[in-house]
């Protein structure tokens, strides 16, 4: 049984730390906000949507930044705003969770032959390039705090997926490679960079037919957003102080 005293001491140690999270509007993003907030972190959320009036967590619009991550100019503008909001210019964690995965007009996955060039470009700008732009722009703040970066990839980045489109899957495979490159480049700055690769997670955007895929998952169930958030938290804290360049599979054994 967890000692309440040790829990309070742990929260005290975490207070004053700041996380910037992209893609916070639902699912894994929501769960991540809750996990870090419960540990005393300040969470600055970023999404293409304005701050919702019915926001499920306590933070207000002062901890939310609306940004179009497909637009390098707007991302640069948002990055400047992020830095202006940081206490003492320190950023303890950056989680790149935002991603898009467009479907065809019939709701089916877009393969290589069906995906237009503009769609490829848009997906890569959000899913891959924005990660680079944010990491470059926030480099000094992360280094000052000896912080951590977590990139959210996907099981679709390592195998053909029945629902995830070709451009989405390719962008996630590229993000896994980028994570290794970033770990090498950010390591000398004292910043760790890792990735998590979720499998089938029980969110509101599950594709029809996902229930059949559960039969092939060794643990026999979908993952929960809170389980993904716990892994992200681990990679952003001192619990993983000697872990960098890794991609953690969170899929109930689906990848084996």
Predicted regions and their residues:
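Short, small/polar-rich loop/turn modules that mediate ligand/substrate recognition or access, typified
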Residues: 187, 192, 243-245
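Substrate-binding pocket helix/loop in short-chain dehydrogenase/reductase
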Residues: 105-112, 116-121, 213
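Active-site helix of classical SDR
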Residues: 135, 171, 179
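Conserved NAD(P)H cofactor-binding loop of Rossmann-fold oxidoreductase domains
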Residues: 97-108, 252-253
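Conserved glycine-rich cofactor-binding loop
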Residues: 25-26
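C-terminal substrate-recognition "lid" of short-chain dehydrogenase/reductases
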Residues: 222-255
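Residue(s) in the substrate-gating loop at a strand-loop-helix junction
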Residues: 154
């Amino acid at each position: 049984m967890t000692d309440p005293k040790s829990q309070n001491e742990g929260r005290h140690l975490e207070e004053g730390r700041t996380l910037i999270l992209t893609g916070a509007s639902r699912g894994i993003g929501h769960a991540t906000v809750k996990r870090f907030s419960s540990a005393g972190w300040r969470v600055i959320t970023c999404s293409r949507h304005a701050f919702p009036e019915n926001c499920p967590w306590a933070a207000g619009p002062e901890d939310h930044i609306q940004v179009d991550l497909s637009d390098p100019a707007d991302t640069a503008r948002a990055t400047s705003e992020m830095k202006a909001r940081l206490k003492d210019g320190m950023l303890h964690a950056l989680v790149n969770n935002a991603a898009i995965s467009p479907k065809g007009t019939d709701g089916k996955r877009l393969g290589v032959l069906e995906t237009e060039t503009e769609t490829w470009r848009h997906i890569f700008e959000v899913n891959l390039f924005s990660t680079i732009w944010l990491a470059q722009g926030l480099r000094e703040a992360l280094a000052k705090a000896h912080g951590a970066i977590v990139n959210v990839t996907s099981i679709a980045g390592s195998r053909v997926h029945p629902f995830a489109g070709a451009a989405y899957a390719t962008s996630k495979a590229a993000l896994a490679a980028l994570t290794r490159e970033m770990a090498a480049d950010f390591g000398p700055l004292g910043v760790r960079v890792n990735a998590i690769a979720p499998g089938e997670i029980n969110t509101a955007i599950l594709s029809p037919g996902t229930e059949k895929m559960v039969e092939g998952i060794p643990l026999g169930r979908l993952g929960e957003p809170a389980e993904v958030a716990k892994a992200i938290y681990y990679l952003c804290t001192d619990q993983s102080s000697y872990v960098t360049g890794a991609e953690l599979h969170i899929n109930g054994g689906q990848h084996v």
